Amino acid sequence: MDKQLLSENNQLSSEEILGLLPHRFPFALVDRVIEHIPGHKAVALKNVTINEPQFQGHFPERPLMPGVLIVESMAQVGGIIVTQMPDLPKGLFVFAGINNVKFRRPVLPGDQLVITCELLSIKRQRFGKVKGEAHVDGKLVCSGELMFSLVD
């Protein structure tokens, strides 16, 4: 699939996202991109359902989305920004670090995460940093900075 595949309305379907990111079930954690400003920002949705495998053990009597999966969702949105930058080399950008991540509210089955990532920097065409936030019903549930690195 062509690296530059955003439609005219700057949105991506789940099928198009699968063409950009290597993640597959159960780690494909972005359902749709609803806004994209190339090279700067992406806003995406993750619908959280009780059918997801993590809820069998986290926690059966009070299911909560693990914080690490919220961060991974934000990282995947950041990965979409990086893959859509025309001046960067093609290849696999992997999640390389996090800074200042804060979890503010639980995320429950039935919630819809609205994830916003903004590009902060690109260095030597190999390293990227984004600021990410995840909201549910307009309330901030998680925020932090995420780093990416191009794998040779």
UniProtKB/Swiss-Prot annotation:
A GO-annotated cellular component: membrane
Localisation per UniProt entry: Cytoplasm
Catalysed transformations (reactions): a (3R)-hydroxyacyl-[ACP] = a (2E)-enoyl-[ACP] + H2O
Presence of the UniProt keyword Repeat in the record: no
Gene Ontology molecular function terms on file: (3R)-hydroxyacyl-[acyl-carrier-protein] dehydratase activity
Sequence intervals crossing the membrane: none
CDD domains named in the record: FabZ
Keyword Cell division applies: no
Active site positions, chain numbering: H58
Record GO biological process: fatty acid biosynthetic process; lipid A biosynthetic process
Pfam families to which the protein is assigned, alphabetical: FabA
Keyword tags: Cytoplasm, Lipid A biosynthesis, Lipid biosynthesis, Lipid metabolism, Lyase
Documented EC number(s): 4.2.1.59
Xref: InterPro entries: FabA_FabZ, FabZ, HotDog_dom_sf
UniProt similarity note: Belongs to the thioester dehydratase family. FabZ subfamily.
Protein task: Involved in unsaturated fatty acids biosynthesis. Catalyzes the dehydration of short chain beta-hydroxyacyl-ACPs and long chain saturated and unsaturated beta-hydroxyacyl-ACPs.
Protein name (Swiss-Prot/TrEMBL): 3-hydroxyacyl-[acyl-carrier-protein] dehydratase FabZ
